[in-house]
């Protein structure tokens, strides 16, 4: 499994808009049911920092891509305008998981 963690801070006046765009991504994912990855997004307690975690599963032969989801494309299209600073992606190793 390969994981990516993305952290960023949104301009306070755009935080609710950012959350709405994220919710649209999850609605699109629910409709499309892509396979091969797990995706979670978190809005931190301060209301302006967000964390996204994508885990790509090794056991799927024809993995779908989050980047192919139209609502995700809309979400990332102007992320730079909504952010205080550019998002910071980091590769991560899954040490453990519980469902």
Question: Which residues does each predicted region cover?
Answer:
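Short, low-order "capping/linker" segments at domain edges
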Residues: 92-99
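Short beta-strand micro-motifs enriched in acidic
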Residues: 42-44
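Short, charged/polar surface micro-motifs in flexible loops or helix N-caps
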Residues: 12, 47-49, 57-62
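Short, surface-exposed ligand-recognition loops at beta-strand->loop->(often short) alpha-helix junctions
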Residues: 9-20
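An amphipathic, aromatic/His-enriched active-site/gating alpha helix that lines ligand/cofactor pockets
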Residues: 24, 28-38, 55-90
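Residue-level preference for beta-strand/loop junctions
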Residues: 2, 33, 46-48
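Active-site-flanking beta-strand signature of metal-NTP-handling nucleotidyl enzymes
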Residues: 2-8
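Polar/charged side chains located within well-ordered beta-strands of beta-rich proteins
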Residues: 6, 18, 39, 52-56
